[in-house]
Amino acid sequence: MDIKLGKYKPVKEEYIKSFKDMLLLRRFEEKCGQLYGMGEIGGFCHLYIGQEAVISAVDMVKQKEDSMVTSYRDHAHIILAGTEPKYVLAELMGRATGCSKGKGGSMHLFDVPNKFYGGHGIVGAQVPIGTGLAFAEKYNGTNNICFTFLGDGAVNQGQVYEAFNMAALWGLPVVYIIENNEYSMGTSVARSTFMRDLYKKGESFGIKGFQLNGMDFEEMYDGVKQAAEYVRENSMPLILEVKTYRYRGHSMSDPAKYRSKEEVETYKERDPITEIRKIILENNYASEADLKEIEQSVKEIVKEAVEFSENSPLPNEEELYTQIYV
């Protein structure tokens, strides 16, 4: 099986939904950055600004019963999995109404009813978990698959390759999506990885891999749809490396001095939201007024999330003793 781009193209409604989804994620993350600067969000906080086309395309392709697991850069993933933004922001602000009851924070977001299994703070630790979720689907005889996200920094972790081996050996229905934003904290892929074509990392296990432009919603939609079909039909793992870019630092405490302003601006010129907006207008899928209305509705969602979170209580002391399993 080879992914030959051009097989699938989004329809009008999917373009419009993706525009709204990506814009919501952008505005939500911008607000998180603002609240962090004001001291309303504590701890670590990793923003997804610039990478929105990746999760938006996966959300379009993913079926309701498919599961997802990702790293600590997880705000966008849980929102598109179906969690209301207000419960995500409440979690970031440490409120009892948060999706993890105010105890997980930015890096440990969970929504099991929506098949979202985290948010994991240890680099690469989610990969064995995603592999296990795929094992459960196969064991239970479902036709569901697991989308397991990891960053370019995680590809050098030993547990990732143990998981790859098990997935190939047992024929597990998992799509490994490597979100290659070029920097593992402040270390570039070129400085940390000999094999820089990360989609080839599974070759020694017989796992097929492909590379996609993660800044291009149309290419992501096409490639992810074909990948999901392959995994679902063959019950075999597959690796997708998506070349993307984060506009902000690794986390809120990272000034990102290891890259130039010119480099960042080069990627911003390919901004996925700007591009999909252009496609929508050029094809008359929606008018300028329609898009302005979407933009206003997104502002209202973010505003509601802030008001809800600010007015939510902090967790009770009793919560220190709940959900403890070890």
UniProtKB/Swiss-Prot annotation:
What are the BP-aspect GO terms? Answer: pyruvate decarboxylation to acetyl-CoA
Pfam families noted in UniProt: E1_dh
Top-rank EC class of the record's enzyme? oxidoreductase
Q: Which GO terms describe its cellular component?
A: intracellular membrane-bounded organelle
Q: List the keywords (alphabetical).
A: Oxidoreductase, Pyruvate, Thiamine pyrophosphate
| InterPro entries according to UniProt | DH_E1, PDH_E1_Alpha_Subunit, Pyrv_DH_E1_asu_subgrp-y, THDP-binding
Q: Which cofactor does it need?
A: thiamine diphosphate
Q: Which reaction does it catalyse?
A: N(6)-[(R)-lipoyl]-L-lysyl-[protein] + pyruvate + H(+) = N(6)-[(R)-S(8)-acetyldihydrolipoyl]-L-lysyl-[protein] + CO2
Q: Which GO terms describe its molecular function?
A: pyruvate dehydrogenase (acetyl-transferring) activity
The source's superkingdom equals Bacteria
**Assigned EC number:** 1.2.4.1
Oligomer and partners: Heterodimer of an alpha and a beta chain.
Biological function: The pyruvate dehydrogenase complex catalyzes the overall conversion of pyruvate to acetyl-CoA and CO(2). It contains multiple copies of three enzymatic components: pyruvate dehydrogenase (E1), dihydrolipoamide acetyltransferase (E2) and lipoamide dehydrogenase (E3).
Q: What is this protein called?
A: Pyruvate dehydrogenase E1 component subunit alpha
Q: Give the originating organism.
A: Rickettsia bellii (strain RML369-C)
